[in-house]
Amino acid sequence: MQRSDPSRPLLEMRGISKTFPAVRALAGVSLTVHPGEIHSLMGENGAGKSTLIKILSGAYQADPGGEILIDGAPISIDGPLAARDAGVAVIYQELCLAPNLTVAENIYVGRELRRGNGRWGTIDRAAMARGCQDVLARLGADFGPNTLVGTLSIAEQQLVEIARAVHTKARILVMDEPTTPLSSRETENLFRLIRQLRAEGLAIIYISHRMAEIYELSDRVSVLRDGAYVGTLDRDSLSAERLVGMMVGRDISGFYKKAHAPYDPGNLLLSVRDVADGGRVRGCSLDLHAGEVLGIAGLVGAGRTELARLIFGAEPRVRGEVKLGGKAFGGHSPCDAIDAGLVYLTEDRKRQGLFLDMSVRDNINISVCGRDARLGALDLARGAQRARDAIAALSIRVPHANVSVGALSGGNQQKVLLSRLLETKPRVLILDEPTRGVDIGAKSEIYRIINDLARAGVGVIVISSELPEIIGVADRVLVMREGRVAGELGGHTGAPITQEAIIALATGSSTEAAAAH
């Protein structure tokens, strides 16, 4: 790989603008990245990060007037091939691999080695396998070039994408939310690899909503807001307050602050005793009180989501009892749960929660449209007003209620789904990874909604893999391990809710876990 002078920018994007019909996505944005630098790019959803990266990758063409320079020389990137030839590689959140091809075939895609007569010769798969062995070994891959990509884990597939970038001699590597599907161990391995690539002189643009990752990796951080460049901070000047203020343009004080009164331990809303599904959930019990926010933490695979779906009636129970308001609740289906005042926000809003091709109005109304029936016909005006009220109450950013929900940012999609649940007037709300894939501003608004619900006497269960979030919003925390509740923190236990205590309980790694249990 060609080495560049680290004191000179490798990439300069100057005055980049992009206009879509009726929307100005970027307005004169500039970005400078040096070789051997991890440069994070932050901003709320809709700030323009993806548009800027798609211009760099050749997927979009910028408006006239801006320019892109590599090693100080202006360059035209008029398509993905031009970006690749310029040394730019992008690893998107949705990986771009062919699962039915081998690792080597994916690495060489579009550059296949052939026998005989140039482009018309037969593909030389053996030569391609030999040709990518070195890069796989260099990156620490424990799979071979002839492995089918479809048999690899998400983390391994991500490694194939990185190997392809390195093999094409990319000098600028863009990574868009790369840790979203990864476990903690896989994330650590990815960070080790990113630092290795930085040491080799690559310029890395890293996009993430996760503050902890930004602090751990970044040499510098640039912030976009509403399609405009706000500023760049060096590592030494990073702080949550400054970053959040730059991203949202307003003060978000007390980001995780509990703003509801202490719950009444005598007002029990939900009681779960020894429930099991015959698989992941192996006998769990919990209590939830009116006005309480109960956090559920644990490692991936601990059974948190499965427990939530079991309580909600989305999965059958093989044993155990659930009481809602002191009365036994059969919970044979989600409809039963909703009718009883118990609702569940799924962790996968796009596949299990929202109707992406339907409007915001219809998504909000779909659980309560029966209320609008008059003589066999729906009162559309009433449903439209309900949607407008929900949009205002939850600060959903949409031009109008008839826009397709699939066109919204992740944070606004999440608030549409929350609106639908809240229209049922629940007594108990289970939120499974409520801020996954949403930006800082939307997170703050979701935390406000949680606090408002608790103040109104709703019992809220929050399942989250982000420990600062769990610690910040929850009155008590239950930690799951291997399908069971391993212990409880906060509340009557007196045990402080800390990251160390949660990890100890989740892993069973210390006597602290046993003591808390």
Curated annotation (Swiss-Prot):
Any one annotated GO CC term: plasma membrane
Reactions catalysed, as given in the entry: D-ribose(out) + ATP + H2O = D-ribose(in) + ADP + phosphate + H(+)
InterPro entries according to UniProt: AAA+_ATPase (IPR003593), ABC_carbohydrate_import_ATPase (IPR050107), ABC_transporter-like_ATP-bd (IPR003439), ABC_transporter-like_CS (IPR017871), P-loop_NTPase (IPR027417)
Subcellular location: Cell inner membrane
Binding positions (ATP): G43, E44, N45, G46, A47, G48, K49, S50
Gene3D superfamilies with a match to the protein in the record: P-loop containing nucleotide triphosphate hydrolases
Membrane topology field: Peripheral membrane protein
Single GO molecular function: ABC-type D-ribose transporter activity
Record keywords, A-Z: ATP-binding, Cell inner membrane, Cell membrane, Membrane, Nucleotide-binding, Repeat, Sugar transport, Translocase, Transport
All copies of domain ABC transporter, residue ranges: 11-251, 263-507
PROSITE patterns cross-referenced by the UniProt entry: ABC_TRANSPORTER_1, ABC_TRANSPORTER_2, RBSA
E.C. numbers: 7.5.2.7
Family: Belongs to the ABC transporter superfamily. Ribose importer (TC 3.A.1.2.1) family.
Quaternary structure and interacting proteins, as annotated: The complex is composed of an ATP-binding protein (RbsA), two transmembrane proteins (RbsC) and a solute-binding protein (RbsB).
Functional note: Part of the ABC transporter complex RbsABC involved in ribose import. Responsible for energy coupling to the transport system.
Protein's name according to its UniProt entry: Ribose import ATP-binding protein RbsA 2
Organism per entry: Burkholderia thailandensis (strain ATCC 700388 / DSM 13276 / CCUG 48851 / CIP 106301 / E264)
